[in-house]
Amino acid sequence: MKRVLVFTHDTFGLGHVRRSLHIVRALCRRLPDAAVLVASGSPALRAVRDLPPNADFVKLPTIVRTGAPGSQPPHLPLELREVTALRASMLCAAVDAYRPDLLLVDNFPLGSRRELLGVLPRARQLGARTVLGLRDIVDRPEIVRASWTKDGVYDALQQLYDLVLVYGVREILDAGAAYGLSSSLQARVRYCGYVTAGRGALRDAAELRRELGVEETLVVATVGGGGDGFPLLRSFVQAVRMLRGLTAVVVTGPLMAPGERDRIRELAVGHAGITVTEYVADLPSYLAAADAVVAMGGYNTVAELLALKQRALVLPRDWRYGDFAHGTGPTVEWEQLLRGQALERLGLLRVLPRECFEPKALAAHLADALTAAGALAQRGRAPIADIDVDGAERAADELVHLLQSEGCHVH
């Protein structure tokens, strides 16, 4: 029986956990007799109800990013270094007791504060193959290169990883070249495509629109987990109130602060066409039925929109988590903006300018997009270019192949 250990980091939001669980499900379908253990500090693990029967998780003490550089443990009254040491010891204990055949690490080659520096060699010493999964875009290439050089990531990649899976496509970013990987490391890189929940059956769009009472136009706004989504949804609700004939569904996500969610609901009071909800069980059906979607530029949200071929209006977050008060300054977080710009160049979505955090500007852009969408509908919807959204399946195939292959570790 093969044993797989998946480590997913618990930075603010749900993206890393959701992406990892999509891959876990695809892997478990291929290896129903394998054991798959997920280790993370993400609070989102507590809400997971649909793990495969041959999978389970280990909850680590949580570390989340804050608006300022660095991280802080949100629950245990311990110093960050103590929580980091505790997490590292728990992971080492899991490796020793579980003895995985494969260790998959999500996006952070050394974990938080280098907590995997002892875990990876121990896993390999016990015979595990080790794989790093990278987001389509980590950050600006020059920032990644500087950070990886400072933290010793290049040496770790060379010595401690057998394979690097990129959860994106080379047309968006050639990670090997952009991040300065050596030729031997680039030979270990596999582009898997975007990781999504898969192509499940969608509800009938006309039926869903009738259920929502849509008379003219349906607009859906979604901000992923929602922890950083308040500025966009605040602007969106006020923008909808400036336009006529709109039915709007506003999905705040489970991580939005209760006070912020209450404020969004207050802004919607008196407008019968605006529904504010924390969660929608079948969000893809709502996105597919909408005349327009307004979203942030996080990985999971964008990947699902690509899978649906829904041309969304995307307003990327370019400030640090919790730091929107300073969001009028220069861009300090590049991931969402770079992703949006690259996909916009391919005609797959439309990036909104930062001014759309003001309701009047967002209302103008939304009205323009709906007018354009109406014109397209009258003359036939223009086809949207295909982009690979089978990342979970292809990543699972790569992992199975590595598990079944013979030979020593790559160095």
Predicted regions and their residues:
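A short, glycine/small-residue-rich beta-strand->loop->alpha-helix junction that serves as a flexible
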Residues: 8-21, 44-47, 230
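A donor-sugar binding/catalytic signature common to diverse glycosyltransferases
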Residues: 282-338
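C-terminal amphipathic helix plus adjacent low-complexity
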Residues: 364, 370-411
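Conserved nucleotide-sugar phosphate-binding/catalytic loop shared by glycosyltransferases and other
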Residues: 6-8, 26-82, 86-93
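A nucleotide-sugar donor-handling region in carbohydrate enzymes
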Residues: 135-230, 258
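Donor-nucleotide binding loops and adjacent catalytic segments primarily
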Residues: 194-292, 337, 355-356
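Conserved nucleotide-sugar donor-interacting segment of glycosyltransferase catalytic cores
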Residues: 90-158
